[in-house]
């Protein structure tokens, strides 16, 4: 996956997770979106600040 594609995918997954939480939907589904974003970011070796943002989202659900 190209960096631009990976960045777009991570952005989409973060928005999905945030929207699920914002609208009181399943925390499990939000966690799944954030975990998938983490995997995409790691595989594409995206910048550390992006990965830290994802980790913060996951920590908020712990």
Each model region followed by its residue ranges:
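N-terminal acidic leader/helix
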Residues: 1-28
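Alpha-helical junction/boundary sensor with strong preference for TPR arrays
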Residues: 24, 41-44, 48
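Acidic, Ser/Thr-rich low-complexity linear motifs
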Residues: 1-7, 46-56
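Residue at a conserved register position within TPR or TPR-like alpha-solenoid repeats
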Residues: 20-21, 41, 62
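Conserved structured catalytic cores and adjacent interaction surfaces
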Residues: 37
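Alpha-helical linker/edge segments of TPR/alpha-solenoid repeat scaffolds
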Residues: 56-62
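Glycine-rich phosphate-binding loop at the start of an alpha helix
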Residues: 31
């Amino acid at each position: 996956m190209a960096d631009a594609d990976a960045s777009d995918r991570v952005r989409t997954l973060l928005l999905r997770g945030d929207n699920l939480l914002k609208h009181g939907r399943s925390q499990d589904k939000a966690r799944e979106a954030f975990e998938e974003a983490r995997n995409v970011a790691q595989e594409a070796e995206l910048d550390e600040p992006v990965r830290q943002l994802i980790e913060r989202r996951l920590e908020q659900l712990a």
